[in-house]
Design a protein with these regions (language model features):
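Short, charged low-complexity linear motifs
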Residues: 6-8, 418, 677
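Generic structural motif
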Residues: 119-121, 176, 391, 457, ...
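A general secondary-structure junction signal
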Residues: 51-53, 103, 178-180, 430-432, ...
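Polar low-complexity intrinsically disordered regions
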Residues: 1, 428, 484, 667-668, ...
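A short, contiguous, amphipathic alpha-helix enriched in charged residues
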Residues: 3, 31-32, 653-666
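Accessory, non-ATPase domains that flank or precede helicase/AAA+ motor cores in DNA-metabolism machines
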Residues: 1-358, 370-386, 671, 684, ...
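A carboxyl-terminal module marker
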Residues: 663, 667-687
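Inter-lobe coupling/hinge segments of SF2-like helicase ATPases
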Residues: 194-200, 204, 217-655, 663, ...
Length: 727
């Protein structure tokens, strides 16, 4: 008699543990990771077979039988299931939810391996069909004439927009064909191709231990600390070439979708069709296609945001996290996993090196490197000894004393004017989208709030509306105060839309592009703006933090940071670290070409150590001060943290449930090394009509607390969000 462990494929907390079913002999040997059909209550459900065992004696309880086997081949490898189990137990989510991270769809839907659409040129096509004004279309057509044809996925990776590809594909003499991908790459050729990727002497020293671990097929975590512009990407390219030369797969992670375009261009120019891209802006068809290319081992370099760490590669030889400090690697909704943890678990399972690269490593990562848990590699200077940019800190209190109430200090204005006069480019950071940050009545002081969330509505000039950035509720701008009927309504604060307007008014003739979430929600818009900025079609790039990292524009000689305090003042233990990262990373965009860069940072806290150290590009100085504060206050890396939020439509029920959880935990964990704090109001009391209370648990080791929560009623409590290792 065979008894199988089955995870039900339904996102229900009550089904977070495997259920037992009989595995009839008629199904023969069924491999772990295969989908099955099982009875559950009065219905039939899809499940995943985790494994089975032979029982010599009949169990004393009744078991129902598996109805059918749904796949001839497993959906999940043993490594994927083991990693999902680690995610489930560490981040406190259901096993089924963790497994679904390894799939394209939220549900495990079977599909045939799709074909790729190719654009193919025939002799009937003439380049003169295309107007000279259609520059991108002609550029693409000339490329197709040169190579004969190419898959749409490759053209997208090369930077051609969906619309350009569509228009060229509709031209007479260019056909769209569906083809199965036929990969004939020679791994020997790729290995020899590694020699064509040059490294400086400093880069070669850093690369050698990584190469050694790949040759030994041995796991190790390398923390690559290299200042901005030191050439970390070149090391990633070199390591990836060696990895795929050995017939293995490399996973390259970047924190933001917007950053995939530049790094994809670097990799595609080196490896061509070996590169496959993953991020959330891809269509389901594109994701299916890319997923299958990996499963069929047609592509061996995977580039993408955090979800790319779950790519179904069975022969991983290298994992890279670029900008490893970035908070975007932590998913903040649904399953709150950190891609860094997953990368380390997968690297360990595949016996391959993991590279964590950053100019501003996470405090916890640098601490682990100094403790010997990671191997520290350093690139302390820019490539070809380019100087770091000159940074000026401006005290905005002094500006106000002098009568300057503008969003631009005198120093910022002069920097913009000089940059434009010299024909160079500038990046300006304002980490706040929208037009005005809140709207208030000047008679009664009423701030217009979201009716579903206890947050102020933000004015967006596009559409002339107020919008909530938490639930996306939007409404027209009121003509009178909803409380006192006064018409004296004023817009306060400055978002990216308002600053863009100010720039256009003060610097007439300047070509300005804005990059924020309101822009990038439109497919391809973000990457097109960055491509055009790289071609110097714009003089100024204004945006939120997505302009701060990973970009390499040779004509950018100036960077302006309008409000350094917006990050310093967020109510999290890592606020100083986030501020130092943002200021240093943004400053590092300046002077990456032949010209020295200049940076102006505006702040109301010029003596804050994060700002002072970022001016000097002094990571070690910042680390030494921050780590002392962390130890004194009991924050990571010295203590672990679990943050809980209890949500309920009724405020009194949220209070009751949260107090019950606190009482339970305090009863079971009376150790002085574990603190249970709360319940108290969450940072935002109400979101989407749900009241929110929070609980914080801290301790040197919280493994026992996690195990208890996972196996208790707390785990299945409706409306409970659990955030392990909040950042």
């Amino acid at each position: 008699m065979r008894v199988a462990s089955i995870i039900i494929n339904r996102p229900a907390k009550q089904l977070h543990k495997p259920l037992s079913y009989l595995l009839p002999e008629k199904f023969g040997d069924v491999k772990a990771g295969t989908r099955v059909l099982v009875p559950l209550g009065g219905s039939r459900e899809e499940g995943i077979l985790i494994g089975y065992e032979e029982l010599l004696e009949k169990p004393t309880f009744t078991l129902r039988s598996i109805i059918d086997i749904l796949d001839s081949d497993p959906w999940f490898t043993r490594e994927m299931m083991d990693t999902a189990q680690k995610i489930s137990r560490y981040f406190l989510c259901s096993f089924g939810d963790a497994l679904r991270l390894f799939t394209v769809h939220k549900t495990l839907k079977s599909y045939d391996a799709p074909k790729e659409e190719w654009l193919v040129v025939t002799p009937e096509f003439k380049i003169d069909q295309l107007s000279p004004k259609k520059r991108k279309q002609r550029e693409l057509a000339n490329y197709l004439i040169e190579v004969g044809g190419a898959p749409k996925s490759l053209l997208r990776a090369k930077g051609y927009s969906y619309m350009v590809i569509k228009q060229v594909g509709e031209e007479h003499g260019i056909h769209i064909e569906e083809r199965f991908k036929d990969t004939k790459t020679s791994f020997t050729e790729l290995l020899s191709g590694e020699e064509t990727i040059p490294l400086t002497e400093a880069q070669q020293i850093v690369y050698e231990p990584i190469k050694q671990m790949m040759d030994l097929e041995s796991y190790n975590t390398f923390l690559l600390h290299g200042v901005t512009g030191s050439g970390k990407t070149q090391i990633y390219l070199k390591a990836a070439a060696r990895c795929i030369g050995k017939g293995k797969t490399a996973i390259i992670l970047v924190p933001e979708i917007i950053l995939t375009d530049q790094i994809v261009r670097r990799f595609v120019s080196t490896f061509g069709d070996e590169v496959v891209v993953f991020h959330s802006k891809l269509t389901i068809s594109e994701r299916n296609n890319n997923w299958e290319r990996i499963r069929r081992k047609d592509s061996h370099i995977i580039i993408g945001a955090r979800s790319a760490v779950f790519a179904p590669a069975e022969d991983i030889g290298l994992i890279v996290l670029d900008e490893e400090h970035d908070t975007s690697y932590k998913q903040e909704d649904m399953i709150r996993y950190n891609a860094k943890n997953v990368a380390l678990w997968r690297g360990m399972a595949h016996d391959c090196p993991v590279i964590l690269g950053s100019a501003t490593p996470a405090i916890t990562s640098y601490y682990k490197a100094l403790q010997g848990q990671y191997k520290l590699l350093e690139l302390p200077t820019r490539i070809f000894d380019q100087p770091m940019p000159n940074v000026q800190i401006v005290d905005m209190k002094e500006e106000m004393i002098r009568g300057n109430y503008s969003v631009f200090s005198d120093a910022m204005t002069h920097l913009i004017e000089r940059t434009l006069a010299d024909g160079n480019q500038m990046i300006i950071l304002l980490n706040r989208r929208g037009y005005s940050t809140f709207v208030m009545c000047r008679d009664c002081g009423e701030t217009i709030m979201c009716p579903h969330c206890e947050v102020a509505m933000v004015y967006h000039q596009a559409g002339e509306e107020l919008r909530c950035h938490y639930c996306e509720h939007h409404e027209p701008i009121p003509s009178v105060c909803p409380k006192c009927q006064s018409k004296r309504i004023k817009f306060f604060g400055s978002g990216t839309q308002k600053v863009e307007e100010e720039l256009r008014r003060h610097f007439k003739g300047a070509r300005i592009a804005r990059l924020d979430q309101d822009v990038t929600k439109h497919k391809d818009m973000g990457e097109e703006i960055l491509q055009d900025f790289g071609k110097h079609k714009y003089d100024i790039l204004l945006g939120t933090q997505m302009v701060s990292k990973g970009h390499d524009f040779k004509d950018v000689t100036a960077v302006g940071i309008l409000t350094a305090d917006s990050v310093l003042n967020i109510p999290v233990y890592s606020a100083s670290e986030r501020a130092f990262d943002l200021l240093t990373q943004t400053s590092g965009r300046a002077g990456r070409g032949d010209k020295v860069g200049s940076v102006v940072i505006q702040t109301y806290n010029p003596l804050n150590y994060a700002i002072i150290k970022s001016k000097a590009h002094d990571y070690l100085g910042f680390y030494n001060e921050e780590i002392v504060n962390r130890k004194d206050l009991g924050y990571p890396p010295f203590r672990e943290m679990i943050y809980m939020v209890i949500r309920h439509a009724k405020e009194e029920m949220a209070e009751s449930i949260s107090q019950k959880i606190v009482d339970d935990l305090e009863t079971n964990f009376k150790s002085p090394s574990i603190d249970v704090n709360g319940p108290y109001e969450a940072g935002i009391k109400k979101i989407r009509d749900m009241y929110r209370l929070s609980i914080m648990i801290r301790g040197e080791n919280l493994d026992a607390v996690k195990d208890y929560i996972y196996n208790s009623w707390i785990f299945t409590q409706e409306g409970l969000l659990i955030d392990v290792d909040p950042i």
